[in-house]
């Protein structure tokens, strides 16, 4: 299946781009979707798996800890939290983002395996990630692996695994896009359902 799209990178190398600038670029370019790809970490080297987040409030301590780590590089301060609360409360993309996150999480879970077993599915979660605030489109943050887990780190170093991650993300994006009215996914000659 071929999904025709234009990918706009907020960065293509390891240079830092402020979290707020990433969403601002997506808005400026009038992107249809925003995907932030991250590597998780934990104090336990045994932690592993995948999880996908969308922007909203949470009382889940684990989700808050992940958001705190990711938000640590933000230019926002605690005193600006009230504005953050207002932005989230006014967001009309929360439900769309939750559905988008579910499609991404399902695809990652179905397509990524650790050896002979699937990666643990840590689920779809909500958290106040600065990088997702203000997005004018459905937006998610995918934690694709734990960099703090030596086995997962080793897999991430292989081009084959990174390609599988990219393909799983792509499949999740296509699955979500197909649920939207008016979106047609182009098919290649070899894909199922393509005209003869």
Where are these regions (language model features)?
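Active-site-proximal helix/loop segments of hydrolytic enzymes
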Residues: 1-196
